[in-house]
A protein has these predicted regions:
Chain A
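Extended amphipathic alpha-helical segments enriched in small hydrophobics
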Residues: 255-265
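A generic structural-conservation signal
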Residues: 27, 267-268, 346
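Ferredoxin-type iron-sulfur electron-transfer modules in oxidoreductases and energy-metabolism complexes
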Residues: 235-256, 274-365
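A donor-sugar binding/catalytic signature common to diverse glycosyltransferases
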Residues: 263-279
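Single, functionally critical "micro-switch" positions that shape active/binding sites
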Residues: 21, 261, 340
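Iron-sulfur-associated redox domains of electron-transfer enzymes in respiratory
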Residues: 1-243, 249-251, 271, 282
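Residue-level detector of anion-binding/catalytic polar loops
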Residues: 24, 264, 343
Length: 365, 285
């Protein structure tokens, strides 16, 4: 299918089409001075005319000089909050005369259309697919949500100072894993379909074939994002670098700065750790087993009866970095990092993992 | 190392319900529970290999990872030896015979018993660490003629911490030489004093290159056991440890049990030492 053109004024028609097909729309919207992902009703909820300015430890919204809908990069949220919900019921147990009756929770009835998924985020979804769907055990919560979602990707036309997707080979161009991908021009979007459902939706919209000039304009817009990327993570030999430097002095250095607040793991679009807890009614006859996001930065994460395994910030920061960039490769055949830069932006003390890796490349004293 | 029996089809969070059929007090704070499935179908399908574990679930309290300590040929009824440690194990201790709880499993890798054929075998168990090795003892006894010299070195903090002592005479008679030791002696104790590693240091090893050692206990104990065994000439590829980490899911999805690149719940708990050593040796990993 050739690239198509959707007039900006017709973006709402796409939303209407998806709503008509039963999808609840989730997309970027401004809330609490950030661009977050939330349920949206119309194009009016999009962060039109806003951009984000990011740096290690800092995030700020600023008005744009134009009316772009998607003229920002990525915010604190990622799509994992819909596919791998922060809180989910795994099992219910009800007391019976002879013991307990246990059941899986009902499958969700809602299905979501994600609007504005960036290339690094498509990569992150693929990383979580590998964790939750492609191992020996399939996570039913993730699967039920993943099977039902519709993905409208958006190609980046600018980059933040914290972006390094080019180092991770995850962006900025959306290559696969979407139903539709948009590139925003000043008056229109170039639309690519990446799946049969995407092509079907296209068939129901007032699209026309893009002209060579329009396609060239889209190419130029996407090139701006590539040109805007300044950060780099050297990935050559990174697995061995990290796993053979487990006693490097840099771990103590970063531990002196790290607050072990877990922000980096919460904003990370691939971190998948969780803990399970019990929620009981007053009589104790109805119990829900609930799974909640957890983080290797929490002390209790590695608690055993004999004590805590990772009992200092040094060992916890080391777990995060070595897991994300090294042991993830052993476990899942790919890096756990997609280069979105969220952990750098949302670190309250501006720790930048690319700098930590660079320092680990220096031999210890 | 062996792969899980079969990838569980369906929802890995679903539990079977099991009923406590019998409770045998072992030592202070430790009892062996015999379980039976409430669903006969599940009972017929259930099989495990020595070294694997189940997740036991008490609704409203939580789950705990507990090794199978039954005879591996047990059908329909099998046992777990459980030490009261915290919330779940305490609540379990409050249930009597007939009590019903949830169970998921079996999970994880198993001891390499087939690799032990034709070889001398040393089992080194610290405290409750003997529980996951008991099915190995049963297998070795059942197929005694296939193995060389068989030794169990069992250490505990005090004489009262030695496990399954009522069975030791049978094991000795069947051809598994049991040696016990305690860290702290007591008035009525005239046995060995010191750690199980001391026993290992003293153990004659006629053919270390043809000896397999399996160990389960606290990390430090396994650490020193491995070191002593290597010094005595056992190859690292013939040492096996069973590791313990916090576990929430037992199916590689919660992240808690990571030890370097390994998920202890899936890749372990039983590891060949040469595979895990670079990570097992690092403090706080
Ligand atoms: C593979 C494996 C096999 C085991 N086999 C046995 C056995 O045969 N017999 C036996 O008595 N014990 C065994 N344990 C230890 C047992 O799992 C813990 O003692 C138990 O989880 C403690 O739970 P609790 O709720 O009573 O204690 P709490 O201290 O209240 O535990 C609270 C939570 O902390 C975590 N936790 C605490 N201690 C441990 C621990 N040691 N290991 C993993 N998670 C922990 C769990 O998530 C638990 O739900 C085994 C552990 C593992 C990992
Ligand atoms: S970095 Fe930490 S929180 Fe994230 S997946 Fe790894 S262990 Fe879990």
């Amino acid at each position: 299918m050739p690239d198509l053109l959707l007039q900006k004024g017709d973006l709402q028609l796409l939303f209407d089409r998806l709503s008509g097909d039963g999808f609840r729309l989730v997309g970027p919207t401004v809330s609490q001075e950030a661009i977050v992902y939330d349920e949206i009703a119309s194009v009016g909820d999009l962060p039109r005319g806003w951009t984000d300015v990011q740096a290690p430890g800092s995030y700020r919204l600023e008005p744009r000089s134009d009316e772009a809908f998607f003229g920002y990069v990525v915010g604190p949220h990622s799509w994992k909050k819909y596919l791998f919900p922060p809180l989910a019921t795994l099992l219910t147990a009800d007391r019976t005369d002879s013991g307990w009756a246990m059941h899986a929770p009902p499958e969700p009835t809602e299905k979501y259309a994600f609007i504005g998924v960036r290339a690094c985020e498509l990569a992150a979804i693929k990383v979580q697919d590998r964790v939750f769907l492609e191992g020996a055990y399939v996570d039913p919560i993730y699967k039920a949500r993943r099977d039902r979602c519709f993905i409208v990707a958006v190609n980046c036309t600018q980059a933040a100072a914290t972006c390094f997707c080019t180092s991770m080979n995850t962006g900025p161009r959306c290559q696969a894993g979407f139903d539709l991908a948009l590139t925003e021009l000043s008056a229109a979007f170039i639309v690519e379909a990446g799946s049969d459902s995407g092509r079907q939706v296209c068939g129901q919209l007032p699209l026309r074939e893009a002209t060579p000039a329009e396609r060239a304009a889209a190419e130029a817009a996407r090139a701006q994002a590539v040109a805007g990327i300044s950060k780099r993570l050297e990935t050559e030999g990174i697995r061995d670098l990290l796993l053979t430097n487990l006693e490097h002095p840099r771990w103590a250095d970063v531990a002196a700065r790290c607050l072990s607040c877990a922000n980096c793991t919460m904003v990370c679009p691939t971190c998948f750790c969780s803990s399970v807890g019990e929620v009981t009614d007053l009589k104790g006859d109805h119990v829900e087993r609930q799974r909640q996001w957890d983080s290797c930065f929490n002390v209790d994460f590695s608690r055993m009866n004999g004590g805590v395994v990772r009992n200092d910030v040094r060992s916890r920061y080391r777990q995060w970095l070595t897991h994300k960039l090294a042991s993830w490769i052993d476990q899942f055949g790919q890096s756990g990092c997609v280069g979105c830069g969220r952990c750098i932006t949302w670190c309250p003390v501006a720790i930048d993992l690319t700098e930590e890796v660079a320092a680990l490349r220096e031999p210890g004293p | 190392m062996t792969a899980p029996l079969s990838p569980t089809v369906g929802n890995p969070w679903l539990c079977h319900t099991v009923r406590i059929a019998a409770i045998t007090p072992e030592i202070s704070g430790v009892a062996t529970y015999d379980f039976e499935f409430t669903d006969p179908d599940a009972a017929n399908r259930y099989q495990f290999r020595p070294g694997q574990f189940n997740m036991l679930y008490l609704p409203g309290v939580g789950e705990a990872a507990i090794s199978l300590s039954a005879h591996p040929a047990a059908r329909r009824r099998w046992s777990h030896t459980i030490r009261v440690a915290g919330n779940v194990t305490q609540a379990l201790a409050q249930l009597g015979t007939g009590g019903v709880l949830g169970l998921r499993g079996p999970f994880g890798s198993s001891w390499p018993i087939d690799d032990c054929r034709g070889r001398d075998v040393i089992l080194v168990a610290g405290g409750i660490g003997l529980a996951p090795l008991r099915p190995v003892v049963y297998r070795l006894l059942a197929e005694r003629s296939h193995f060389g010299q068989l030794t169990l070195l069992h250490g505990a903090r005090s004489p009262g911490g030695l496990l399954y002592t009522r069975e030791h005479a049978t094991w000795n008679a069947g051809g598994v030489a049991v040696q016990t030791t305690v860290d702290r002696t007591a008035a009525d104790w005239n046995g060995n004093v010191g750690t199980a590693v001391v026993l290992l240091d003293r153990l004659p090893l006629p053919r270390p290159e043809n000896t397999v050692l399996l160990t389960c206990g606290p990390d430090v104990m396994m650490h020193f056991t491995a070191r002593a065994a290597l010094q005595r000439g056992l190859p690292a590829s013939q040492l096996w440890i069973s590791a313990e980490r916090n576990m929430q899911c037992a199916v590689g999805l919660c992240g808690h049990c990571q030890l370097g690149p390994e998920f202890v719940c899936q890749d372990g708990p039983v590891f060949r030492y040469d595979r895990i050593a670079p990570f097992f040796r690092v403090e706080g990993l």
